[in-house]
Amino acid sequence: MIQVEMQDVNKWYGAFHVLRDINLTVTRGERIVICGPSGSGKSTLIRCVNRLEEHQKGRIVVNGTELTNDLKKIDDVRREVGMVFQHFNLFPHLTILENCTLAPIWVKKMQKREAQEVAMHYLDRVKIPEQAHKYPGQLSGGQQQRVAIARSLCMNPKIMLFDEPTSSLDPEMVKEVLDTMVSLATEGMTMLCVTHEMGFARQVADRVIFIDAGQIVEIDEPDAFFSNPRHLRTRSFLSQVLH
């Protein structure tokens, strides 16, 4: 089953052409890793999937719903698409448990007790149930990012988007977040992940996409992508990020 379909997608920021003729199909359970230099359009691409960014040309269909200016359709898609950002975006004045139950209660109209049970299940899933009654400021960066993942999972998404989820973390915290994402991948979650963590890409990706100057330059399975990239721009990029 196709979960995300992008056809000839283009986007501009004023005169800047940030996405150029993007064509991409993602099937259920597929893990896609998107890499490329800074400013290449990686984050914009995945932010278009849940309409955090609006494309100006082409079609984007998510779980059978085409993204247009219809606000109800946008809301329907966002209920099914979880997103984890570079910065954790947790509410500092709410406890970890309250951060995780807010959307299920207000958006899905879930009863508080049920929402708390779901939240504790996913906090346990990301291995920090003991932090439930603390506030975000009391947690490490890695713990906060795992809370952000749990919070997204509480909405029972069909697709997870990750926008450089480890880039603002100290090196010793990166592994704990990547381990959580690897675990999600092994359970069959459909994932689109923007990251420079090439070891993660090798381990979990079904396909790796290299994007540069708003264009998909190369897309391939990890073994072929890393061992025999076809394009000079891909080879140049990999020579810089693989140490």
Segments predicted by a language model, with ranges:
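Absolute protein N-terminus
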Residues: 1-2, 243
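ABC family nucleotide-binding domain
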Residues: 2-222
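C-terminal boundary and immediately downstream tail of ABC-type ATPase nucleotide-binding domains
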Residues: 213, 219, 223-243
